[in-house]
């Protein structure tokens, strides 16, 4: 599986798992993108892709390091609520046991099913020092940024 495919599948998986609700509209954007969403979005950015020799000694694996950010402009308490709800939904997503990359597979009668891709894993790292608001003491419109690093390891194509 190629790194771009991993990133795309992960973004789709996030969008499915963190479904929009009345209190929070969810938009997942892969950067770079010409999409200029108003409000708070989840951005997925490629940081690095590399052959991972430590994952499984018997087979070749590739690790894709991504930045997943809840970011945007908060103009009111409603925007602040939306940002915190998205962060909490991401926390819930990453707390799943044995988190694996998923893909949608066409089945009989054009039925789509979600399949966990074997021998994949998804890990996250969070820095407790990350800033949420750039200037928390200001009463002006605020830019928010909550970053986490995600590492997805997949079997490498032969």
Model features per residue range: what roles?
Residues 55-63, 71-97, 102-108:
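Extracellular/virion structural assembly segments
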Residues 50-52, 76-78, 136-138:
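Residue-level signal for secondary-structure boundary sites
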Residues 1-58, 154-158:
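Small/polar-rich, solvent-exposed N-terminal microdomains that initiate assembly or binding
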Residues 27-29, 41-45, 65-69, 100, ...:
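Ser/Thr- (and often Asn-) enriched beta-sheet segments in non-cytosolic proteins
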Residues 89-145, 157:
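Acidic-leaning, charged glycine-interspersed low-complexity segments
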Residues 58-59, 85, 142-153:
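Short intrinsically disordered coil segments
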Residues 60-77, 121-134, 146-148:
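Oligomerization/assembly interface segments of phage tail-like spikes and tubes
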